[in-house]
């Protein structure tokens, strides 16, 4: 299979995802695993990618449903069930 990365769910973000994936894989294999660095050096690429994804979530109308699902998430308090008002 090699080093094939998956595309982003939002096609307009795929280039940013590819850049982040490449940066992260290089950092992880060449620095982190060899004990040369513990700080992820790809935060700029990650921020650019997540900003694009968040914009796509809004554009596609997915964000409100995602926010609602996060509100209803049963394990959002350190693995403990969230108390629900009855």
From Swiss-Prot:
One Pfam family, short name: UPF0203
Lineage: superkingdom: Eukaryota
Motif (Cx9C motif 1): 13-23
GO cellular component, one term: mitochondrion
Motif (Cx9C motif 2): 42-52
Single GO biological process annotation from the record: intermembrane lipid transfer
Alphabetical UniProt keywords: Cytoplasm, Disulfide bond, Lipid transport, Mitochondrion, Nucleus, Transport
Cystine connections: 13-52, 23-42
Cellular location(s): Cytoplasm; Nucleus; Mitochondrion intermembrane space
Every CHCH domain range: 10-60
Note: Present with 3870 molecules/cell in log phase SD medium.
Family note: Belongs to the TRIAP1/MDM35 family.
Purpose: Involved in mitochondrial distribution and morphology. Mediates the import of UPS1, UPS2 and UPS3, 3 atypical mitochondrial intermembrane space (IMS) proteins lacking the two major IMS-targeting signals, into the intermembrane space. The UPS1:MDM35 complex mediates the transfer of phosphatidic acid (PA) between liposomes and probably functions as a PA transporter across the mitochondrion intermembrane space. Phosphatidic acid import is required for cardiolipin (CL) synthesis in the mitochondrial inner membrane.
Complexes and interactors: Interacts with UPS1, UPS2 and UPS3.
Protein name, entry field: Mitochondrial distribution and morphology protein 35
Taxonomy of the source species: Eukaryota, Fungi, Dikarya, Ascomycota, Saccharomycotina
Gene field: MDM35
